[in-house]
């Protein structure tokens, strides 16, 4: 009996029908299993065994025992469904069609509950930290510092889980004269960073499968990387030149802007009937505290009294246990109809309850959504959807594909009125491999643009005497995102967020606890540390920040040279092996965390060490793809 490799005309080439130029070689793969026994081999679900491409590629020193994987967003577990199967009968076809038709409304229901859970999660964070956010905004001396303003924008948006809420607070403070436009611009930049924490949390729910987790986390953090890189360039530029302030002032002065209606709540029309039964908040309390109005200090954020006419604006009132309706300023107030209207619990307790419940609902809906999508997107269906989403325009207009994706992302975000909802909704699709990270990047950039249109429309609803300043700060948000796109998208070599996100995804797939560390570090610990240094004065900021920044720049430069041109470096600097292991590797920390978390667990039998996975997009430029080649003594086993 001949081996599979000889049957295919090559050496140890797997027959599985997975797309892409994947290769495997080495002694560990001397025997290639057939598809019928593949599912019985432990750990094979994470591997795709594609065939070698038709082009003959030269050797490039690929050591034995490595798996070289070319980028292909369609995962192996979906592509395996394309195997030849016997033709099903009529009854089986009808049964499959019925099950599919039943899955579609179920999937839409889970998607609806997923979006509602994001809304309730935002309310929970506002109950737990909304007053703290209002107090942070109150100190104008702090906000006059650009770095402190940036950190305030990050922390407040993380606390309230809504960039729309934090931006509306800033707009109201600017329009009331409590905050200058120049001081509000760094806060807007910070809110742009803080809003990306939601889809990063959503990506954590796919940590069960390392391959899916790698893609999902990379797709979520590409938003973070873009925002952080944009701030690192544009915040010093704005502090030195004030270009955003000057451009937006010219735009406002050039147009005869008139006040209009409020921003349309297209998605809330669908979600509010459900979320209003759970909780209703009086967000004017946060805005009043930020404006310095201490009369509402002891007022609860939980709304108890509501106007039956939705066009009327309710007046903040303390909780009351009296009648179900009362008269105030010739208007009838009725008790609101939600779960926590008469509980008497403090805001913090209600916020923690809602936080736990919304996270549980979010996790459940996301897991069920992923399973539904996995069952629906099989074989040819997955290939068609993947091809439609990830295929570029014809050759003369290939460059326009990404910009069209930006328009789609902006339009969808305008419809759902939330960039967090849109990016969180596409994160599971990125994890499944239906949307590639290269396509998710322009979609995310378009989402950044779409969320600014909501702020612009909200500013147009301001009173005439406050319209100019409110519209100017909303335009600052818009031009900040446009500037970031001009920096990090038009030229392919400047698309650093994609490479950074892929590196983060690869790291988190290897050490899954790193995702939690990343969240704490980027959205809590690092902003808090920078905020403390900025409050200590510019001398402390420069004294600590300058050496740290120089060290970081040196490490980034040397790492890039080690990857691209190691010959340019001294021999001792071509690797970081001269440093202690804990300085340049996460293995010691991973060992400690593993021992701490599994000390009471029953040890499982360890499988043989898996081969190293090398991704072609991480090889230096102009590097030919390693082709399958073995010495004669490593030939495939004959059965």
From Swiss-Prot:
Membrane-spanning ranges: 104-125, 146-163, 166-185, 348-370, 413-436, 467-487, 514-534, 540-561
UniProt-annotated location(s): Apical cell membrane; Cell membrane
UniProt GO MF annotations: sodium:phosphate symporter activity
Modified-residue entries (Phosphoserine), positions: 14, 34, 607, 625
Cellular component, GO annotation: apical plasma membrane; brush border; plasma membrane; vesicle
Topological domain ranges for the Extracellular compartment: 126-145, 186-347, 437-466, 535-539
Highest taxon in the source lineage: Eukaryota
Disulfide bonds: 225-522, 306-336
One GO biological process term: intracellular phosphate ion homeostasis
Catalyses which reaction(s): 3 Na(+)(out) + phosphate(out) = 3 Na(+)(in) + phosphate(in)
Membrane topology reported for the UniProt record: Multi-pass membrane protein
Cytoplasmic side: 1-103, 164-165, 371-412, 488-513, 562-639
Keywords, sorted A to Z: Cell membrane, Disulfide bond, Glycoprotein, Ion transport, Membrane, Phosphoprotein, Sodium, Sodium transport, Symport, Transmembrane, Transmembrane helix, Transport
Positions of modified residues (Phosphothreonine): 508, 623
Main location per the UniProt record: membrane
Positions annotated with a glycan in the UniProt record: 298, 323, 330
Assigned protein family: Belongs to the SLC34A transporter family.
Function: Involved in actively transporting phosphate into cells via Na(+) cotransport in the renal brush border membrane. The cotransport has a Na(+):Pi stoichiometry of 3:1 and is electrogenic.
Subunit and partners: Interacts via its C-terminal region with NHERF4. Interacts with NHERF1. Interacts with TMEM174; regulates SLC34A1 internalization by PTH and FGF23.
Name of the protein described by the UniProt record: Sodium-dependent phosphate transport protein 2A
Species for this entry: Ovis aries
Lineage: Eukaryota, Metazoa, Chordata, Craniata, Vertebrata
Gene: SLC34A1
């Amino acid at each position: 009996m001949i081996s599979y490799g000889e049957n295919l005309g090559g050496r140890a080439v797997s027959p599985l029908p997975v797309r892409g130029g994947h290769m495997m070689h080495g002694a560990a793969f001397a025997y290639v299993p057939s598809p019928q026994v593949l599912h019985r081999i432990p750990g094979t679900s994470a591997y795709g065994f594609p065939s070698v491409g038709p082009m003959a590629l030269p050797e490039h020193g690929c050591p034995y025992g490595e798996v070289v994987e070319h980028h292909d967003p369609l995962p192996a577990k979906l592509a395996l469904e394309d195997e030849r199967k016997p033709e099903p009968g009529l009854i089986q076809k009808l049964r499959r069609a019925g099950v599919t038709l039943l899955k579609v409304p179920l999937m839409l229901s889970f998607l609806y509950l997923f979006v509602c859970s994001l809304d309730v999660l935002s309310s929970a964070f506002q109950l737990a930290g909304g007053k703290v956010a209002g107090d942070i905004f109150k100190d104008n001396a702090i906000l006059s510092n650009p770095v402190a303003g940036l950190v305030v924008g990050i922390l407040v948006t993380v606390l309230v889980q809504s960039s729309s809420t934090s931006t509306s607070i800033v707009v109201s403070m600017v329009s009331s004269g409590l905050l200058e436009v120049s001081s509000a611009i760094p806060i807007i930049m910070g809110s742009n960073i803080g809003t990306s924490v939601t889809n990063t949390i959503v990506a954590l729910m796919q940590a069960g499968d390392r391959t899916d987790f790698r893609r999902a986390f990379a797709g979520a953090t590409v938003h973070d990387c873009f925002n952080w890189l944009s701030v690192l360039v544009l915040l010093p530029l704005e502090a030195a030149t004030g270009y955003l302030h000057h451009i937006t002032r010219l735009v406002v002065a050039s147009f005869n802007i008139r006040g209009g209606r409020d921003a349309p709540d297209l998605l809330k029309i669908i979600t509010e009937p459900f979320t209003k039964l759970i909780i209703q908040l009086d967000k004017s309390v946060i805005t009043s505290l930020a404006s310095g109005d201490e009369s509402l200090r002891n007022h609860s954020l939980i709304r108890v009294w509501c106007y039956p006419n939705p066009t009327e604006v309710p007046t903040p009132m303390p909780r009351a246990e009296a009648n179900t309706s009362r008269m105030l300023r010739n208007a009838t107030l009725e008790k609101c109809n939600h779960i926590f209207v008469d509980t008497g619990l403090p805001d913090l307790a209600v916020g923690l309850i809602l936080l736990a419940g919304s996270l549980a609902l979010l996790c459940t809906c996301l897991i069920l959504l992923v399973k539904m999508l996995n069952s629906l997107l099989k074989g040819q269906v997955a290939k068609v959807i993947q091809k439609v989403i990830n295929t570029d325009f014809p050759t003369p207009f290939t460059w326009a594909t990404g910009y069209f994706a930006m328009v789609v992302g902006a339009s969808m975000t305008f419809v759902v009125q939330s960039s967090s909802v849109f990016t969180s909704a596409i994160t599971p699709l990125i994890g499944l491999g239906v949307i590639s990270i290269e396509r998710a990047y322009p979609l995310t950039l378009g989402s950044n643009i779409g969320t600014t249109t909501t702020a612009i429309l909200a500013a147009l609803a301001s009173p005439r005497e406050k319209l100019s300043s409110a519209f100017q700060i909303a335009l600052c948000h818009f031009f900040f995102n446009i500037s970031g796109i001009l920096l990090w998208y038009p030229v392919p070599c400047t698309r650093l967020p994609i490479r950074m996100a892929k590196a983060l995804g690869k790291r988190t797939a290897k050490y899954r606890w790193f995702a939690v560390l990343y969240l704490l570090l980027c959205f809590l610990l690092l902003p808090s540390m920078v905020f403390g240094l900025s409050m200590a004065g510019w001398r402390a900021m420069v004294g600590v920040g300058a050496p740290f920044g120089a060290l970081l720049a040196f490490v980034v430069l040397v790492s890039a040279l080690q990857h691209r041109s190691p010959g340019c470096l001294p021999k001792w600097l071509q690797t970081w092996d001269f440093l202690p292991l804990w300085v340049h590797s996460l293995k010691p920390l991973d060992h400690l965390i593993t021992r701490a978390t599994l000390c009471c667990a029953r040890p499982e039998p360890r499988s043989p060490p898996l081969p190293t996975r090398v991704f072609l997009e991480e090889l230096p430029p102009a590097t030919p793809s390693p082709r399958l080649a073995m010495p004669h003594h490593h030939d495939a086993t004959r059965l």
